[in-house]
Amino acid sequence: MSAKQSKAYAEPDFWSKKAFSEGYPARSVYKLREIDEKFDFIPNPKNCNALDLGAAPGSWTLFLLRKFNGEGHIVSCDLNELAKNVKGDNLTFIQGDLNDAAVREKIGSLGPYDIVVSDAAPLTTGNRIVDTARSEQLVDMALWYAGTMLKTGGNMAVKIFQNGSQQALLQKMRGMFESAKGFKP
């Protein structure tokens, strides 16, 4: 990492500061908020069952918790722990590898789900080809969960690295869902 890159990570930008001031562990919360506002993504939370894949540090989970306001249920899964302030009586956190059969079984036992979200990102290497391939694997895994555990008519939001192959992933999603749109919040 160059000195310029490392400085960018050392100093929080406007969105990071805003997220922290609102109690969110990361600025990624604004992606899901904008998706929800633009597409009315999150249904009535009263009976909603949500799955957050690759959830740590927990901004998307916390957004769902606040949106649900104690109703519905959220299942979040990640290799890493959620931030300490991401908690609720209607939250089940599973720490583990999404590829692990026991984790899949546990997540499946708590479904089916009305929405599946994934802001999962691989540990980046700096090699665009490697990082993109790893990101695509995470998207494919999220699509497997959605295809297996999402209720008919359910919604999914997933982060895809912009690399040229996102059109192929969108095409795959169009075969799975009533509609699929690329959107850059």
Please place each PLM-identified region on the residue numbering.
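Class I SAM-dependent methyltransferase Rossmann-like catalytic core
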Residues: M1-P45
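A generic alpha-to-beta junction signature in SAM-dependent methyltransferases
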Residues: P43-N44, F68-N69, M149-L150
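Conserved class I S-adenosyl-L-methionine
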Residues: P45-A56
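Glycine-centered, small-residue-biased loops immediately flanking beta-strands
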Residues: C48, G72, G154
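C-terminal substrate-binding/active-site "lid" region of AdoMet-derived donor-dependent transferases
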Residues: L51, A83, N127-P185
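Conserved SAM-binding loop of SAM-dependent methyltransferases across substrates and taxa
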Residues: P57-G70
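Conserved SAM-binding motif I beta-strand of class I
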Residues: H73-D78
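S-adenosyl-L-methionine
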Residues: L79-L123
